[in-house]
Amino acid sequence: NETPFPVLSEEGKHMDYAVRRGWDTLWIVDPLDGTKEFIKRNGEFTVNIALVQNAVPVMGVIYVPVKKELYFAVEGTGAYKCSGIVGLEDEGVTLQQMIEKSKRMPLADARDHFIAVASRSHLTPETETYIADLKKKHGNVELISSGSSIKICLVAEGKADVYPRFA
């Protein structure tokens, strides 16, 4: 389907900033976040889409195809997770219908330890130092290694406390 707004994507046509700075509203799309994870076939890749108005993101979608999980947030509405999504070919699906099928985040229950999530493919010495400092501060720290924007979803969902990124 066509959109009245331009689409900015690293896989798409390169547009000079002189052209892009005039865009009041645009889509930003990463159709394959976690390329290394996709190549490894470990399922830790996502499709990321954002709608930006006047340089402010107003809607974001992260889809995890292998898990059939859809994370989405809309300004003024909240953040949600919908499981079991195969496709949204029906153009008649409304935001309200999606919200009704979803769970509002954060979802996680209380726990007795701190959880950090880090990149599976880009674990830096700075991140390792930061996690060591977390262990000194919190004692019991669990480290979850994951790929793509799944790490951000885990924090949004409440399943992780922090995603340190220094690169």
Where are the model-predicted features located?
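Short intrinsically disordered, low-complexity coil segments enriched in acidic
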Residues: 1-10, 79-80, 142, 160, ...
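N-terminal subdomain of lithium-sensitive/metallo-dependent phosphomonoesterases centered on the IMPase/IPPase/PAP
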Residues: 1-32, 87-89, 96-99, 129-132, ...
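Generic detector of well-ordered alpha-helical packing
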Residues: 11, 31-34, 65, 152, ...
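Short secondary-structure boundary/capping segments
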Residues: 17-20, 62, 105-108
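DPxDG-like acidic metal-binding loop motif
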Residues: 20-84, 88-96
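An extended, acidic
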Residues: 94-167
